[in-house]
């Protein structure tokens, strides 16, 4: 039985992940052993009501020492680099919630260390692990124009536009690899970013209107729609992480590419 540790409780992902593992028993080989409420301790009772966790740690270091792998779910990406590096330095696989890091340099360094140590490092938006993407990957990758759409608040209190934009940049780079901004526009709270990748163009559109994430792509001259579940995404993310911890192959290069694309888009509007 592998012991899982959760760092952070401010995000609802704490109880979502904890419930899947400890209550629903979706992963027989894993159990949440400890949680470290280092970001918003007053939310801990709410989390524990929904997923019982025996060990409460006062620090990330204490949690890392007591667990075999870590779910790092503090909200702000500015906290992710140092905490994820502590996990890797201790030889522990780690899942880093989105947005992955605050800078490209931080992302690349984490990826390099994980590769050097042979440790699993996954994370970002769990929408990327939706099985329907893999089933339709060839068609999506061959589409000359792909449209990614999701809800995002440009003025999010959790770091602004980048917080929710990361869902779409993670999806785009996980499918197409390195991408670069061509142009962007904003009308009220709706933002569209046109980006170029090696085989075509992608459009990333966000608005305040609540809706499930959509990927619209061309297939044999017709538009096809792929809707990604935002209820199953948490389980999909854990499926990928725990499979990788158990030895399944995984890729994570897209995470630094996504951080770079976030920077291009947010800087575009800052410089206007």
Question: What does each model-found stretch correspond to?
Answer:
Residues 1-51, 141, 242, 253, ...:
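N-terminal Rossmann-like dinucleotide-binding module
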Residues 11, 75-78, 100-101, 127-129, ...:
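Short beta->alpha connector loops
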Residues 14, 44, 80, 107, ...:
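A general structural signal for well-ordered alpha-helical segments in protein cores
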Residues 36, 148-210, 260:
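Rossmann-like dinucleotide-binding domain that binds NAD(P)(H)
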Residues 46, 51-111:
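Beta-loop-alpha module in the N-terminal Rossmann-like domain of NAD(P)-dependent dehydrogenases
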Residues 46-52, 62, 66, 70-72, ...:
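C-terminal helix-rich "cap/oligomerization" subdomain common to oxidoreductases
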Residues 101-158:
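A contiguous active-site-proximal alpha/beta segment in oxidoreductase catalytic domains
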Residues 186-245, 249-256:
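NAD(P)-dinucleotide binding in Rossmann-like oxidoreductases
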């Amino acid at each position: 039985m592998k012991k899982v540790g959760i760092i952070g409780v401010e995000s609802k992902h704490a109880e979502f992940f904890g419930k899947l593992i400890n209550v629903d028993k979706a992963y027989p080989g894993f159990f949440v052993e400890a949680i470290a409420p280092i970001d918003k301790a007053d939310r801990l009772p709410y989390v524990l009501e929904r997923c019982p966790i025996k060990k409460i740690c006062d620090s990330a270091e204490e949690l890392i020492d007591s667990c075999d792998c870590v779910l790092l779910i503090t909200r702000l990406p500015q906290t992710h680099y140092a905490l994820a590096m502590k996990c890797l330095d201790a030889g522990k696989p780690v899942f880093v919630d989105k947005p992955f890091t605050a800078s490209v340099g931080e992302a690349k360094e984490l990826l390099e260390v994980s590769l050097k140590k042979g440790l699993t490092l996954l994370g970002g938006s769990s929408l990327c692990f939706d099985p329907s993407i893999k089933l339709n990957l060839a068609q999506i990758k061959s589409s000359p124009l792909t449209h990614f759409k999701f809800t995002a608040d440009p003025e999010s209190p959790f770091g602004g536009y980048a917080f929710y934009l990361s869902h779409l940049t993670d999806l785009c780079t996980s499918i197409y690899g390195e991408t670069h901004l061509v142009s962007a526009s904003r009308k009220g709270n709706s933002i569209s970013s046109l980006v170029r990748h090696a085989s075509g163009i992608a459009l990333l559109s966000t608005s305040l209107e609540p809706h499930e994430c959509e990927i619209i792509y061309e297939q044999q001259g017709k538009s096809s729609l792929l809707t990604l579940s935002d209820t199953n995404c948490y389980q999909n993310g854990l499926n990928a992480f725990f499979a990788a911890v158990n030895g399944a192959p995984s890729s994570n290069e897209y995470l630094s590419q996504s951080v770079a694309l976030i920077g291009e888009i947010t800087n575009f509007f800052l410089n206007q």
